[in-house]
């Protein structure tokens, strides 16, 4: 089962129910809607398709709105584009009403003149063309520049000024309209472009609260040096983070991007906040059916770094192979997770310097350690807000984390968290009911089977957010009976119900479990072949108890109506330490 989540961008290449269904079946968990392109009508049509696919497939699918953000672009160019050569002089004007040419281009942000300095650099089209600022014409408010390289400058291309604090607004009027539209139509996540400071996130959160949609999770995209410098304060007010390597690689030296990625991921992991690694992960698959070896390595390293999700942009939105791109990313994620399984101890140690003092986080770490020690494959976390599941996920357990939640909105918000399988359940009224519901739902969804040992995490008083304080080890399945155990061992075998010594001696074979009302010396031929005994007669000095200790086999005595409750020939597990008899095979006792 894949634990790393996949964010898949929708676009012209994935614009029908059949393709979106294939993307979901290939492993996409969250669908990204890029509001830098398209209109509300187009996006709503795709959102409706995602919800239809969710109902059709039964898979939990999230919807993420990616804002256009406050960005600087060139205006249109005369003739659409032109070529500039190394050493050419060109001016950059702040007049956004005019078209550009090889002598002068115009940009959409008038403050660029004030924010930049002589000797600085202006990059066009993700760095395809670099301009060095030679002088500033104060009278005309134009930057006098020299081309660093030969290249093409086109219409409406992105403009960056590396290392410069740009005083653009956190969210634009378009962003506000787009976010309100998304909130109205049930989005689950907002990916906020060009976030530079905490206030940018708070402005978006205010829009969510205004729409009574505080459940929508906000993931700022860190794309500039200013955002990197302010990362700690940004994370404090955010629900997660996107490492957006595209503009980041233009705004800061590209050689620093891998190390910034690792730092940002580690900070998110330590706080238990999900992080997405994005941009050009399988970029060549826009045109080719297979990724390059470098791309495979890039995705794998992001997973090893600790990313919660890996993202596809143009690969699934505009490329020739959208489904194959998701499938390739799925396969890389799953293969890499096998390596993570062997590194769990490192995951448990890596947050020593970040340890908090709250109970939920302490229990999260304890749960993962316990699961690792006992070989538990499923952790069931009852969570009202999703916090408990995230605090367990941060330690990257080998076990699957089943998040039992009672709100569909919280369920969808957990769909992007590493290793978490969010399941909607009816809200129980007390802790005992919760344990029963947790076992039932996990079994119903195929996460566990009878006999599995699971860890259930919850809070008392039940149902209140932030009260996680309870961890319980529980065996899934039917406990048939209870008695007094003799010894400390456990055994699995076929039940042989015998009402007399003669019947027992005739029916019991090597390794069977003898079930009888009582025993005496006449039962010894059968007892010597048995791997365990269940007896209705009680007492630690009874024949069965004494013989069991002598032979070193598990025995449970004082089991009322054992010969009538237990079916002859059925498979049983006898746990002498607990004095319990279970239907079927139970491991990890």
UniProtKB/Swiss-Prot annotation:
Record: residues binding K(+): 34, 36, 66-67
The keyword ATP-binding is annotated on this UniProt entry: yes
Keyword Kinase: yes
Pathway involvement of the protein, from the record: Carbohydrate degradation; glycolysis; pyruvate from D-glyceraldehyde 3-phosphate: step 5/5
GO MF, one example: pyruvate kinase activity
Matching SUPFAM superfamilies: Phosphoenolpyruvate/pyruvate domain (SSF51621), PK beta-barrel domain-like (SSF50800), PK C-terminal domain-like (SSF52935)
Family annotation (Pfam families): PEP-utilizers (PF00391), PK (PF00224), PK_C (PF02887)
EC nos: 2.7.1.40
Binding site for substrate: 32, 246-247, 279
Amino acids binding Mg(2+): 223, 247
Top-level taxon of origin: Bacteria
Catalytic activity: pyruvate + ATP = phosphoenolpyruvate + ADP + H(+)
Annotated site residues (Transition state stabilizer) in this chain: 221
Annotated ATP binding sites: 34-37, 73, 157
Cofactors (names): Mg(2+); K(+)
Keywords annotated in UniProt: Allosteric enzyme, ATP-binding, Glycolysis, Kinase, Magnesium, Metal-binding, Nucleotide-binding, Potassium, Pyruvate, Transferase
Activity regulation info: Strongly activated by glucose-6-phosphate, ribose-5-phosphate and fructose-6-phosphate. Weak activator AMP and weak inhibitor fructose-1,6-bisphosphate can act as strong inhibitors in the presence of strong activators.
NCBIfam families reported for this sequence: PRK05826.1, PRK06354.1, pyruv_kin
Family affiliation: Belongs to the pyruvate kinase family. In the C-terminal section; belongs to the PEP-utilizing enzyme family.
Subunit structure: Homotetramer.
Name of the protein described by the UniProt record: Pyruvate kinase
Annotated source species: Lactobacillus delbrueckii subsp. bulgaricus
